[in-house]
């Protein structure tokens, strides 16, 4: 996967790329999109975009797959500085990208906030759970690939240009306590241009520095400095001062 991923935006559909295709082909394309649920996705995206801005803005600030389960409390804040794409992401791997995976879930509890600080893509099956009075901020050009989970009880901040792979889990809370009085919830901070490999897990209290790489399957329990590569469970430094190529 690379930053070359073609994200599917609210103002562009796959078939629009073939604007010069013959009339019959175009109608076939439209019919295919309607049958595949694209029309429903646009309707749902219009609803969320209007709810966000209070009027219809083009291009739509929110583009959401119709299957996405949205649950945003009345007192919650959804802030989108540029655009949020949910449930659509075509990778260069395979012919069908990541279509057909699980539905997305976006949940923001009472008083919670989800702040999208630019253009952010959440791939199919990604679940974003922001608890009551909790805050999740995601920076410009960051993307999260299929089936990852961002679980926020207190505060999670993800910088810009981050690549978060498949099946990653970020949790700022343990949910339960081992020792009485011990802190089981602490802020997670992910810097800019961080690459988090598939099936990695980032636990409470961790800060990851700019440009760091988290290897596939790593369980990160301690801070990672800028430019480090960490791997394993618990994650240990395996390389330093790297520059990964998007
Ligand atoms: C992090 C990663 C990119 C590093 O690649 P690399 O620079 O070629 O690293 P190396 O293969 O030189 O490995 C360096 C050391 O870390 C270890 N290591 C690398 N990845 C590891 C992993 N996922 N888990 C445990 N150890 C790992 C290697 O065994 C090696 O150990 P050694 O020095 O004792 O031999 C790569 O290991 C990785 O995790 N790739 C998967 C990325 C991914 O999930 N992509 C999905 C799409 S975004």
Go through each PLM region and give its residues.
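Domain-scale signature associated with acetyltransferase and cell-envelope carbohydrate enzymes
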Residues: 2-169, 191-193, 226, 235-239, ...
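Glycine-rich hexapeptide-repeat left-handed beta-helix
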Residues: 160-246
């Amino acid at each position: 996967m690379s930053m070359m991923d073609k994200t599917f935006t609210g103002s562009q559909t796959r078939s629009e790329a073939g604007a010069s295709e013959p009339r019959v082909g175009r109608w076939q394309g439209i019919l295919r999109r309607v049958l595949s649920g694209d029309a429903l996705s646009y309707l749902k995206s219009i609803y969320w975009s209007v709810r966000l801005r209070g009027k219809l803005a083009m291009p739509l600030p929110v583009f959401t797959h119709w299957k996405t389960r949205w649950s945003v409390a009345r007192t919650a804040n959804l802030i989108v500085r540029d655009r949020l794409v949910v449930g659509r992401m075509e990778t260069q791997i395979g012919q069908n990208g990541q279509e057909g995976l699980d539905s997305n879930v976006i949940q923001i509890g009472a008083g919670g906030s989800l702040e999208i600080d630019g253009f952010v893509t959440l791939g199919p099956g990604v679940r974003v759970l922001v608890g009551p009075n909790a805050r999740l901020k995601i920076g410009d050009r960051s993307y999260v690939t299929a089936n990852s989970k961002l679980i926020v009880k207190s505060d999670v901040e993800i910088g810009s240009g981050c690549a978060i792979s498949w099946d990653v889990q970020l949790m700022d809370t343990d949910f339960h306590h081992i020792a009485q009085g011990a802190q089981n919830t602490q802020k997670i901070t992910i810097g800019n241009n961080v690459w988090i490999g598939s099936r990695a897990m980032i636990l409470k209290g961790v800060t990851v520095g700019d440009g760091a790489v988290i290897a596939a399957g790593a369980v990160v329990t301690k801070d990672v400095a800028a430019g480090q590569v960490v791997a394993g469970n618990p994650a240990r430094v395996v390389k330093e001062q790297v520059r990964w190529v998007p």
